[in-house]
C-alpha cells in the first residue's frame, strides 16, 4: 500500500499572477509567496485482487475500465502514470475538498500522481509532480487556474514562486524559528461554511 500526504496552501501575495496569460505577457512575469499548511490531502493506492478500479472519495466508484471514472483527476492521473487497472484509490481531506481557496484540488492531483508513480515503482521529483499536475488540470481538463497551487503542494514549505514565459522558479524562504513560531501563534484559519 502506498500512502501520500500532500499539503494545502495559503498565499500572502501575488494571487492571479500565476495564470499563464498574465505570467507570460508581463515583463517580470508573476510571483506569489505561498505557505504550505499543516492540513493535508491523503491518498492511498492499494493493489486489488482483480483488474477493476475502485475509487473512494466523497463518493465511491467501481469500474472495469478506468476511462469510465467520473472523478476526472483520478482518471487523468491514472492515464498519465500508466496505472490503469487492479487498484483501489482512496482520497481523504483534512479540509472541505472544494471551494476553500486553499488549493485542495491541486493537492489531490499532486498526491494522486505521487502515490501512483510510487505504486508503479518510480520516484519523481517535486518539479515533475507539479508540472504533471499542471498538465492535467490546465492543459487536459481546461481548468481556468494558475500554477501556484500545484507547485505549493509538490514542494511544501514557505516559498517565493516566480512564473514567466520561460517556466517556474521556486525559492524557499528561510524563516527564523521565531518567525515560524509567531506565524503559528498569530495565523488562524477559519472555515466559514461558504465556498467560493
Regions picked out by a protein language model, each given a short descriptive name:
Residues 11, 104-106, 146:
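Short linear Ser/Thr-Pro motifs
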Residues 1-63:
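Generic N-terminal targeting/processing segments that precede catalytic cores or assembly contacts
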Residues 33, 102, 161:
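Short clusters of hydrophobic/aromatic residues that line enzyme substrate/ligand-binding pockets
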Residues 38-136:
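Anion-binding (especially nucleotide phosphate/pyrophosphate-binding) glycine-rich loop
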Residues 2-4, 9, 16-22, 27-30, ...:
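ATP-dependent small-molecule kinase catalytic core of the GHMP/sugar-kinase superfamily
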Amino acid at each position: 500500500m502506498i500512502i501520500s500526504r500532500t499539503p494545502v496552501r495559503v498565499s500572502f501575495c501575488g494571487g492571479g499572477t500565476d495564470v499563464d496569460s498574465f505570467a507570460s505577457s508581463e515583463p517580470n512575469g508573476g510571483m506569489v509567496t505561498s505557505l504550505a499548511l499543516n492540513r493535508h490531502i491523503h491518498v492511498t493506492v492499494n493493489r486489488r485482487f482483480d483488474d477493476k478500479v475502485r475509487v473512494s472519495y466523497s463518493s465511491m466508484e467501481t469500474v472495469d475500465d478506468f476511462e469510465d471514472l467520473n472523478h476526472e483527476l483520478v482518471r487523468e492521473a491514472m492515464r498519465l502514470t500508466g496505472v490503469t487497472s487492479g487498484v483501489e484509490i482512496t482520497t481523504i481531506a483534512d479540509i472541505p475538498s472544494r471551494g476553500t481557496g486553499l488549493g485542495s484540488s491541486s493537492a489531490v492531483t499532486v498526491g494522486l500522481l505521487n502515490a501512483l508513480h510510487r505504486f508503479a515503482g518510480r520516484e519523481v521529483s517535486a518539479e515533475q509532480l507539479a508540472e504533471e499536475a499542471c498538465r492535467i488540470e490546465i492543459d487536459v481538463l481546461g481548468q481556468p487556474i494558475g500554477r501556484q497551487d500545484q507547485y505549493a503542494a509538490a514542494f511544501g514549505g514557505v516559498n517565493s514562486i516566480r512564473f514567466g514565459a520561460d517556466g517556474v522558479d521556486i525559492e524557499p524562504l528561510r524563516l527564523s524559528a521565531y518567525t515560524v513560531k509567531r506565524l503559528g501563534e498569530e495565523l488562524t484559519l477559519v472555515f466559514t461554511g461558504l465556498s467560493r
